[in-house]
């Protein structure tokens, strides 16, 4: 199979899966928006924000599991892929149980950052307390999706995402309008979809294992302390890297809020364009992760180098296409997100930054995938940490005189630094991944 076909076999379903990610929240929002009071809508906005931050921090479960599984699968160690799945699920269930146990302090901490009325806060708490019971399922699904992707299967996660969203729509509408449960019906429909999605993913994973005669045993999962150490090391670096990402994105919004509601809204609209780019680039990053990890496990250095070239050819082409679309049709795209004249005018005055975002950000996205596939997660952390320091330093220097332009320049510099720092490390990581000692370890 050519590198281009291997990339597209993972990237296209992954992009479609990525597009479905916000749908669970959109469905809740759309249903709540027709319940007769804005309090329900505001409560879901707050609850969704709290869960978004929480689950983003634990995305390492998907990435770490995916990279390690891809390498084990590439070296035909099917028993090890089974143990990786079991270790990941044990950690996911443990974290999920901890989140449930700590829901009250976590809820109070999250709400301390929100400015809202008492009725909205009451509804947000009720919504949160229902959906927190989906934490073990959501985190387990991260592990299962990463594991399936590591085995070069991107279609099953897409199928699960579609089933989840259809079930969420149907169950939420039934509970809200059929049983009159209002906000609790919205939460209940989402909770049901989360658990069914996890159960469905587990079914497909176990079916895959049975085909290869691999059955993970709990005792075997605990026996190899070295494997646990490796699993935790890979994931700790991803977790710290995610903290840096969240800090930058949160600060971008916070810094923009100081410029008033119009610029804050304009920045939010332009970031939606960046989100669209990220869904596509992440799909190709997943391909780099899955195919790259598989080639590391198989010891195919020449094919890995061809994979890198093919990935960047796709990335460069698509990023330039996005830039052209934003440059030529940016005004129309902005109008899709808002009809507020002041916000549209402000967003259009900063449109150049959205045009520059795709090519500047492209390397960071693709290298993330390759670094996960080679389990070089310390390099990912270094790249994002250096870039984050650059963002805060540049913003401090430029914002006092350039205002919102300074914020966007700092953000572009952050994205560029991510790619540059990680790109500088790539040759060393490739040599290390395919060194004789590494190949012996993989096999």
Question: What annotation goes with each model-predicted range?
Answer:
Residues 161-168, 272-273, 385-394:
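Small-residue-enriched core segments of transmembrane alpha-helices in multipass membrane transport
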Residues 26, 63-64, 138, 143, ...:
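Residues that mark transmembrane-helix kinks and helix-interface sites
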Residues 1-11, 69-136, 167-170, 176-236, ...:
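Short alpha-helical transmembrane segments in multi-pass integral membrane proteins
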Residues 41-101, 138-157, 266-324, 328-330, ...:
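Small-residue-rich hydrophobic transmembrane alpha-helices
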Residues 14, 18, 29-30, 67, ...:
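Transmembrane alpha-helix boundary and packing residues in multipass membrane permease domains
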Residues 22-42, 111-118, 174-181, 243-276, ...:
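Helix-terminus/linker motif at the lipid-water interface of multi-pass membrane proteins
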Residues 9-28, 130, 134, 141, ...:
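Transmembrane helical elements of multi-pass membrane transporters/channels
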Residues 2-35, 49-64, 68, 93-100, ...:
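N-terminal transmembrane alpha-helices
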């Amino acid at each position: 199979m050519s590198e281009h076909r291997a990339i597209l076999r993972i990237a296209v379903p992954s992009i479609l899966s990525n597009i479905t990610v916000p749908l669970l929240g959109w469905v809740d929002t759309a249903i709540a928006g027709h319940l007769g009071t804005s309090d329900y809508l505001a409560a879901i906005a707050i609850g969704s924000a709290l869960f978004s931050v929480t689950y983003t921090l634990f995305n390492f479960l998907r990435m770490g599991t995916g990279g390690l599984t891809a390498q084990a699968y590439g070296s035909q160690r099917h028993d090890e892929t089974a143990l990786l799945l079991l270790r990941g699920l044990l950690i996911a269930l443990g974290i999920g149980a901890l989140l449930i146990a700590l829901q009250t302090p976590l809820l109070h901490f999250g709400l301390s950052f929100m400015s809202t009325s008492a009725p909205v806060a009451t509804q947000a708490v009720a919504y949160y307390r229902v959906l927190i019971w989906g934490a073990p399922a959501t985190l387990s699904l991260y592990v299962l999706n990463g594991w399936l992707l590591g085995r070069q299967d991107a279609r099953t996660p897409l199928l699960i995402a579609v089933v989840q969203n259809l079930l969420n729509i149907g169950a939420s509408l039934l509970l809200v309008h059929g049983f009159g449960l209002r906000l609790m019906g919205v939460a209940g429909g989402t909770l049901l979809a989360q658990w069914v999605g996890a159960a469905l993913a587990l079914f497909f994973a176990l079916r895959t294992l049975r085909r290869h005669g691999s059955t993970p045993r709990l005792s075997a999962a605990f026996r190899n302390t070295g494997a646990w150490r490796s699993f935790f090391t890979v994931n700790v670096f991803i977790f710290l890297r995610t903290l840096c990402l969240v800090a930058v994105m949160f600060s971008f919004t916070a810094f923009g809020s100081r410029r008033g509601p119009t610029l804050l809204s304009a920045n939010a609209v332009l970031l939606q364009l960046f989100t669209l780019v990220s869904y596509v680039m992440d799909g190709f990053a997943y391909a780099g992760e899955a195919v790259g990890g598989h080639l590391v496990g198989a010891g195919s250095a020449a094919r890995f180098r061809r994979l890198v070239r093919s990935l960047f050819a796709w990335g460069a082409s698509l990023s330039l296409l996005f830039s052209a679309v934003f440059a030529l049709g940016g005004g129309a795209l902005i109008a899709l997100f808002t009809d507020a004249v002041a916000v549209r005018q402000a967003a259009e005055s900063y449109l150049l930054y959205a045009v520059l975002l795709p090519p500047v950000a492209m390397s960071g996205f693709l290298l993330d995938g390759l670094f996960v596939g080679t389990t070089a997660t310390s390099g990912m952390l270094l790249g994002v940490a250096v870039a984050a320091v650059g963002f805060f330093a540049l913003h401090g220097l430029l914002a006092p005189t350039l205002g919102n332009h300074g914020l966007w320049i700092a953000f572009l510099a952050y994205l560029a630094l991510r790619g540059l720092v990680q790109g500088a490390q790539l040759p060393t990581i490739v040599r290390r991944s395919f060194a004789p000692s590494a190949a012996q370890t993989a096999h």
